[in-house]
Amino acid sequence: MIPKKTKLKSREIEVPGDKSLSHRSVLFAALSKGKSKVTGFLEAEDPLNTMSAFAKLGLKVQKVKPGEYEFESPGKNKLVSPNVDLDFGNAGTGIRLSAGLICGLPGINATLTGDNSLKKRPMGRIIKPLSSMGASIVGLGEKETAPLKIEGKKLKGFRYESPIASAQVKSCLMLAAISSETDLEYSENILSRDHTENMFRFLGNKIEQISPLHFKIKPPYVLNGGEFRVPGDISSAAFFLVLGVLAKEGNLLIKNIGLNPARTGILTALQSMGAKIEIQNKRIECGEPVGDLKTYPSNLKKSNIPESLIPSIIDEIPILSVAGFFAEGGFEIRHAEELRAKESDRIHTMVSNFRELGIEVEEYTDGYSFDGTSKKSSEVWTRLSTVKKIPIQSYMDHRIAMSFLIFKTLSGLDLQIDETSWIETSFPGFEKLLESCINE
């Protein structure tokens, strides 16, 4: 067995605001005529890039204090074409959702771009259905990738059966329909995150729910300014959940975390592995369930992760894989080919880094598997514990960098991560918070 070494201070912590909700708060503020207020906004590069993009379209932005912003929009029909390209940096959510919204605004012409990593990510998944709605959108990069050139126009009603469970595709098409005041009927095979639907309802709109996987929306839409409170991001909390359950001693109470059922797959997965995590103070805020999460040191074991759970843990699979290394019997993830379309090809990234550590990993087109706390992995750990400066490649991916920082903390290995600046895209202050939890 791999020995548990990490001792934690028993303390309360908070993680930054939910990235998905921070993006969406800007988008709905831009659509809604008048003033909107957001508290708990994630002041990380990705959502700030989305905010900057819509400021160029005519959204007035005022920072009240850290994490709190006031927006004023002239209304969707009075937004203006930007005179420069809209740079979304590394924000896949930002560019895909914004593309849908802008496609439905007649007279608005814009080019949406991003960094080198974003320019490699697939955009055909939104270009095809948007084009079927009548949108003028072209991917100027190879294989329909960004930059995206858009000429906004009035779109037509559309019925779409999504071949993938993707909240980004669903939200993109919803925002296109909302901005263009047209109807949308949407269905998917597995339930994806429903933050856009919740915020849409919170503003006073109705959704005709035909089944849990099938819905309709139709105008007129209610688009008045609102006040949004963004809870802590469970994807960010996931790193500290794994830290807490794999520590030798100490408890963490992670406050004010969004507990949307489409996002709590990480809790289901960890608890099925034997993790003891307690939900406290559960409540509803701005249409989203919120609560506090308390961790207890636990002994983990291998657990089968069903295909139906994959959409709700897709961003947490790297840190869940780290937990799997400490689990009796190891770890296996399948049906997760979507990992290859993230900030990096996360299947390749995790496999190559684990192999660099000497861990035997089986790679599949849709996932990977490896032994956990077996004799063989214990031997690997014993050998690595004497090695200095073991290189880890982050591949410009914030979640890979954070996952291996947690791995480094738990294992005591001298891992040298090539670059950690990517963490700023989602979790500013991560390393400082991590250090503050350790009881030396």
Curated annotation (Swiss-Prot):
GO terms for molecular function: 3-phosphoshikimate 1-carboxyvinyltransferase activity. InterPro entries: Enolpyruvate_Tfrase_dom, Enolpyruvate_Tfrase_sf, EPSP_synthase, EPSP_synthase_CS, RNA3'P_cycl/enolpyr_Trfase_a/b. It catalyses: 3-phosphoshikimate + phosphoenolpyruvate = 5-O-(1-carboxyvinyl)-3-phosphoshikimate + phosphate. The active site is at 315 (proton acceptor). PROSITE patterns: EPSP_SYNTHASE_2 (PS00885). GO terms for biological process: amino acid biosynthetic process; aromatic amino acid family biosynthetic process; chorismate biosynthetic process. It is found in: Cytoplasm. Pathway: Metabolic intermediate biosynthesis; chorismate biosynthesis; chorismate from D-erythrose 4-phosphate and phosphoenolpyruvate: step 6/7. One of its GO terms (cellular component) is cytoplasm. Keywords: Amino-acid biosynthesis, Aromatic amino acid biosynthesis, Cytoplasm, Transferase. It holds the Pfam family EPSP_synthase. Phosphoenolpyruvate binds at residues 19, 92, 121, 168, 346, 399. Transmembrane segments: none annotated. Its EC number is 2.5.1.19. 3-phosphoshikimate binds at residues 19-20, 24, 166, 168, 315, 342. Monomer. Catalyzes the transfer of the enolpyruvyl moiety of phosphoenolpyruvate (PEP) to the 5-hydroxyl of shikimate-3-phosphate (S3P) to produce enolpyruvyl shikimate-3-phosphate and inorganic phosphate. NCBIfam families: aroA. Belongs to the EPSP synthase family. This is 3-phosphoshikimate 1-carboxyvinyltransferase. The gene is aroA.
